[in-house]
Amino acid sequence: MGRLFGTDGVRGLANTELTAELALQVASAAATVLASPGSGGRKTAVVGRDPRASGEMLEAAVVAGLTSAGVDVLNVGVLPTPAVAFLTAELDAALGVMISASHNPMPDNGIKIFAAGGHKLDDEVEDRIESVATGTATRRAPTGAGIGRVHTVPDAADRYLQHLTTALPNRLDGLTVVVDCAHGAASDVAPAAYRAAGATVVAINAEPDGLNINENCGSTHLEGLQKAVVRHGADLGLAHDGDADRCLAVDAGGSLVDGDAIMTVLALGMRDAGELVDDTLVATVMSNLGLHIAMREAGISLVTTAVGDRYVLEGLRSGGFSLGGEQSGHVVFPAFGTTGDGVLTGLRLMGRMAETGQPIAELASAMTTLPQVLVNVKVADKRAVAASPVVLDAVLAAERSLGENGRVLLRPSGTEQLVRVMVEASDLEVARKLADELAGTVASV
């Protein structure tokens, strides 16, 4: 068996790769590792999910696994991933479990686990959970009164909405937003949050039926949102994914405002308000060179991490910084949460618009996106490519030819025998030519 945990929990085709049996084993193992009995009474676990059909089956299995290990379950129902992380801390739970495959198609599902305080797990803790789940370490199995009980949390959504309200320093009166909820976990709370802050809200794709999550909508399919923003004459559009841990935006003309541009707007606003710790932003190596240039021109330092919001979080924690994120729209505000929060990002973005009186297109123009070409190359051995002197020489030659006007990044896939070749340059044709040449070199190894 390969490693259970990927870059964002356990994920796979529901009922084939991610079975009820596996969900029970993982939940029981997580409870064994993260909720050891001690003083203060029985430990608790928050459980939430997105609305995809398999979530009900997996929720039942997760609840069974947790209670079989002696943990009481606080079931919060359908809520975004960041809400589950927040409630794990708010309710003083020993762990939290979110059942979701995020932006993946409906047939997939996943299990994300949070430690006490709503923090994502590090590799060492994941390895310990995996050891218990696969039977190489002993799981806890109490009997009688030691078995956990199940409780619902009827005010879970209200608690999360109140939390979001406290994170927004100003009102959004006068702004009109179209929000694409991806028929996902934020279909109720996202429109409610934006309305509570004073915005006029047009909600689309906010009628989940268990089967339509992420189907031609949400942050991976922006076409419908772009048309709706123009049709309604809205100030902007916001797109969430199935579990609402990310947010992308669309300006009044229907043009994309991606995660890099969103971070630019937020970083400049937080700097002006004295909220940007050490005038530093944390982003991944996949962020566009245009973000680097914009931050440098603004006097803001940029710390780069590996791809994945868990690595952004590590960078934020290690430096004590206050803003980080990814091009894909995961944005983290450590003062208000422990993971990417799409609804909070949308609120803060509109807050900057309300504060300045400027449209989002004007605010986002502080960053110019450089042309980027990405080529996926199938390889026999990713490690051989990484160690190849021929590939290294080709990368160095490409970097010399670009100088300060571009960059090159080779990144092995975390799940497939692929190497991703990315080239950015001020000229699209130059980027294409270099990317194709490098892809050919990688393929020849």
UniProtKB/Swiss-Prot annotation:
Cofactor info, note text: Binds 1 Mg(2+) ion per subunit.
EC number of this enzyme: 5.4.2.10
Molecular function via GO: magnesium ion binding; phosphoglucosamine mutase activity; phosphomannomutase activity
Source taxon at top rank: Bacteria
InterPro entries assigned: A-D-PHexomutase_a/b/a-I (IPR005844), A-D-PHexomutase_a/b/a-I/II/III (IPR016055), A-D-PHexomutase_a/b/a-II (IPR005845), A-D-PHexomutase_a/b/a-III (IPR005846), A-D-PHexomutase_C (IPR005843), A-D-PHexomutase_C_sf (IPR036900), A-D-PHexomutase_CS (IPR016066), Alpha-D-phosphohexomutase_SF (IPR005841)
Keyword Transferase attached: no
Modified residues (Phosphoserine): S102
Catalytic activity as recorded in UniProt: alpha-D-glucosamine 1-phosphate = D-glucosamine 6-phosphate
Cellular component GO terms, alphabetical: cytosol
Residues reported to bind Mg(2+): S102, D241, D243, D245
Active site per UniProt: S102 (phosphoserine intermediate)
GO BP: any one term: carbohydrate metabolic process
Cofactor(s) annotated in UniProt: Mg(2+)
PTM per Swiss-Prot/TrEMBL: Activated by phosphorylation.
Gene3D superfamilies named in the record: Alpha-D-Glucose-1,6-Bisphosphate, subunit A, domain 3 (3.40.120.10), Alpha-D-phosphohexomutase, C-terminal domain (3.30.310.50)
Keyword list, A-Z: Isomerase, Magnesium, Metal-binding, Phosphoprotein
Entry-linked PANTHER family: PHOSPHOGLUCOMUTASE (ALPHA-D-GLUCOSE-1,6-BISPHOSPHATE-DEPENDENT), PHOSPHOHEXOSE MUTASE
Function: Catalyzes the conversion of glucosamine-6-phosphate to glucosamine-1-phosphate.
UniProt xrefs under HAMAP family: GlmM_B (MF_01554_B)
Family: Belongs to the phosphohexose mutase family.
Descriptive protein name: Phosphoglucosamine mutase
Native source species: Rhodococcus opacus (strain B4)
